[in-house]
């Protein structure tokens, strides 16, 4: 992790809920393990929840890892804004590129999911991140996601 000094104090779900618009069961991340101005590392066990809001037909498909990647971006944006004394600008996911899924489903995985997301490009009204999601060291999904930002409230 590069950029601003690394923040290594673990951040729990309660703090994540203060930073993002995703609330209740739709908040997919449980903890931030490390972050800096350019990147973030997170982990979660939410994929094992039988009541997961994205489940369909009693399965949680790997396609939903794109939402995990997008929410990693939101958590990172919230942390960056809070570190600057402000609030994150609301964003809307507008594109996914180069997404590769290496499994079909994730609800059967027993350990935590881990994600690393990194800012690739950003401007005043948009951001693009790369994300990689792993389980026990095995790559599950990777890709890029772009968001358009609205002015912060």
Model-derived segments and spans:
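Compact, glycine-rich, soluble single-domain proteins
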Residues: 57-76, 91
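HotDog/MaoC-like acyl-thioester-processing domains
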Residues: 2-9, 75, 107-111, 116-153
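Conserved positions in beta-strands of structured domains
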Residues: 17, 33, 102, 116-120, ...
